[in-house]
């Protein structure tokens, strides 16, 4: 059996992780000087409940090579001979490089090992890498080989389309995604920036006034960009407001001819630190 692993920014639900035996290397979150492991020491609902009251913005840190090594070693001890690790974009974090170092350390220690390890730089964030991970798990369950799953990821990883909008511009300002002037103008005009990924980095691709316009934007972009042969499922993400994601799901079902699964999953602490409360996202395969 092929082992699939990732980092905690993939934001897949606990149910999915358990169902497909996917292991995560946790990022760290520094909250008022105390360091937590994402999804180990702190969980999304707990974090979002305290977020507004925090006097300063939390910071995040990438998983260490040791975290990846631990998962790889456990997988090998369990009898896995093939390991695929799908990481958040190297353009936004050092997580990919940490995983590469962990793999290199393993083969330095065991140069004659017949274990296969492939590290994927997903060029994605949040449920974008999560989309690839879930697709890889489904391929594995259907009998795809290690080589076939690796080839799919490397060929199609840049086709995972991201859309993410935020409710609080201060988080994008703090993370360097907005200038101070843009944030001020956005607040005055009640504009919600819409972000996507370009060359493995986050970029603002649009602005809409009000949530209703945002959901309309998402639906129209899906109709225009979706590859019906490749989009087996859609993932919708949210930080604190599940109802908004449900509304977007209903709109997609009403306004488009998509008949596949639409998964709703909460964004985790690491991603939520940068996008804040009220964020909503959509992920699918584009043409």
Question: Which residues fall in each region the model found?
Answer:
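Short amphipathic alpha-helical segments and their helix-coil junctions
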Residues: 70, 115-116
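Local beta-strand N-terminus motif with an aromatic residue
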Residues: 1-2, 80
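Mixed-charge interfacial surface used for oligomerization/domain docking
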Residues: 3, 9-17, 22-23, 28, ...
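N-terminal glycine-rich anion-binding loop in soluble enzyme alpha/beta folds
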Residues: 3-63, 67
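Short acidic, glycine/Ser/Thr-rich loop/turn "cap" segments at secondary-structure junctions
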Residues: 84-87, 117-121
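Glycine-rich phosphate- or other oxyanion-binding loops that anchor nucleotides, phosphorylated ligands
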Residues: 53-104, 146, 150
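Flexible loop/hinge segments that line or gate small-molecule binding clefts
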Residues: 112
């Amino acid at each position: 059996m092929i082992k699939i692993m990732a980092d905690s920014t993939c934001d897949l639900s606990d149910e999915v992780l358990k169902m497909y035996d996917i292991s995560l290397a946790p990022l760290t979150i520094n909250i008022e000087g105390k360091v937590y492991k994402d999804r180990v020491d702190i969980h999304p609902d707990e974090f979002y409940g305290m977020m507004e009251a925090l006097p300063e913005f939390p910071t995040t840190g990438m998983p260490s090579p040791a975290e990846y090594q631990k998962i790889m070693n456990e997988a090998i001890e369990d009898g896995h001979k093939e390991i695929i690790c799908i990481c958040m974009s190297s353009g936004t974090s050092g997580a990919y490089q940490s995983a590469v170092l962990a793999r290199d350390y393993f083969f330095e220690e065991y140069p004659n090992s017949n274990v296969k390890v492939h590290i994927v730089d997903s060029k994605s964030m949040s449920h974008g890498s999560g989309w690839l991970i879930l697709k890889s798990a489904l391929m594995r369950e259907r009998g795809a080989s290690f080589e076939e799953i690796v080839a799919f990821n490397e060929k199609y990883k840049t086709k995972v389309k991201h859309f993410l909008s935020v409710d609080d511009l201060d988080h994008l300002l703090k993370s360097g995604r907005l200038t101070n002037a843009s944030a001020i103008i956005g607040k005055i005009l009640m504009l919600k920036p819409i972000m996507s990924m370009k060359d493995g980095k986050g970029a603002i691709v649009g602005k809409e006034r009000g949530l209703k316009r945002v959901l309309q934007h998402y639906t129209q972009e899906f109709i225009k960009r979706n590859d019906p042969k490749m989009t087996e499922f859609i993932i919708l993400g949210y930080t604190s407001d599940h109802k908004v994601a449900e509304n977007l799901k209903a709109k997609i079902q009403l306004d488009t001819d998509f008949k596949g699964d639409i998964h709703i999953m909460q964004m985790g602490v690491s991603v939520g630190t940068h996008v804040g409360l009220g964020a909503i996202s959509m992920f699918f395969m584009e043409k």
